[in-house]
């Protein structure tokens, strides 16, 4: 058996991921369907590593998101969970005592 062939790895084919922004997509503050893909649940801008964008695309996305926020077509924060009504303990109507 030839020793040089023992250490060669078989070449596995892999499927290249499609870029999140196509060539026809315009990065614009009015394109809400595109912008919303790059925002987290809390309304934060996702990082470039998570988005798999180039540096130029990430910069353009960030500028578009900030413009949309300023023009109030996008909220700065998305904290609906913060204001949800939860089960609270009933308040007592007895006399109050001061702590000394």
Curated annotation (Swiss-Prot):
Localisation: Plastid, Chloroplast
InterPro entries: Ribosomal_bS18, Ribosomal_bS18_CS, Ribosomal_bS18_sf
PROSITE patterns: RIBOSOMAL_S18
Region (Disordered): 81-100
Keyword Methyltransferase set for record: no
Low complexity composition-biased segments: 89-100
Keyword hit for RNA-binding: yes
GO cellular component, one term: mitochondrial small ribosomal subunit
Residues in coiled coil: none
Subunit structure, interactors included: Part of the 30S ribosomal subunit.
PANTHER family: 30S RIBOSOMAL PROTEIN S18, SMALL RIBOSOMAL SUBUNIT PROTEIN BS18M
The name this protein goes by in its record: Small ribosomal subunit protein bS18c
Annotated source species: Nandina domestica
